[in-house]
């Protein structure tokens, strides 16, 4: 069963109110509860809907493979700075095992409804190499993990290693999910790359 989303017919100007609502279901095999943050933009809402639909359908497949009641729920964070919105989604899925499985995704857009990517904020194409170096240095500085090889692996210059981010006056905030740079018990690891280290690297983005 697909998620039912109600979309507001509005222009692509940030005038319509955004709102959050909940979609949930419970059966003998599974329970899911999805908190949905709806933006004023149909294209952004569709992107969110398609991703949530896909992950929910994947989760439901497990009802045929185990004898436990599976669980699926979501959370999100919204950050805004200079007319840019960073909507970070987190899916917690339990289908057996020691703990929940975490899936995350980010939807970045401006106040005109244009969807943005991390590369849009940087002047040069080698920005991932720069982020790899700077994030590794910050993680070492805060003592995120004594295993330096783990840190290096989790900060390799690959886009998936920098999927949760937002900019503000302090600089670039990065979140590394559990297991990426440290054990599960450490939880998400958050760092800030100061603006002073990015001043010659980032470019203005239309908001």
PLM segments and residue spans:
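Sec-dependent N-terminal signal peptides
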Residues: 4-15
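Compositionally biased intrinsically disordered regions enriched in Thr/Gly
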Residues: 18-106, 110-207
């Amino acid at each position: 069963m697909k998620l039912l989303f109600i979309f507001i017919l509005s222009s692509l100007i940030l005038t319509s109110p955004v709102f959050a609502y909940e979609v949930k279901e419970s059966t003998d095999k599974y329970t899911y509860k999805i908190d949905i943050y709806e933006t004023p933009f149909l294209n952004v809402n569709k992107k969110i809907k398609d991703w949530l639909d896909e992950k929910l359908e994947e989760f439901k497949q497990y009802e045929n493979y185990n004898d436990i009641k599976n669980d699926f729920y979501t959370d999100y964070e919204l950050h805004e700075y200079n007319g840019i919105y960073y909507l970070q989604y987190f899916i917690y899925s339990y289908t057996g095992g020691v703990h929940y499985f975490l899936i995350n995704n980010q939807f970045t857009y401006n106040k005109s409804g244009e969807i943005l990517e991390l590369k849009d904020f940087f002047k040069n194409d080698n920005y991932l190499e720069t982020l790899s170096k700077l994030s590794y240095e910050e993680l070492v500085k805060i003592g995120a993990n004594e295993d330096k090889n783990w840190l290096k692996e989790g900060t390799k210059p690959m886009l998936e290693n920098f999927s949760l981010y937002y900019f503000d006056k302090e600089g670039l905030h990065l979140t590394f999910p559990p297991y990426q740079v440290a054990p599960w018990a450490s939880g998400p690891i958050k760092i800030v790359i100061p603006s002073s280290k990015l001043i010659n690297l980032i470019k203005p983005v239309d908001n």
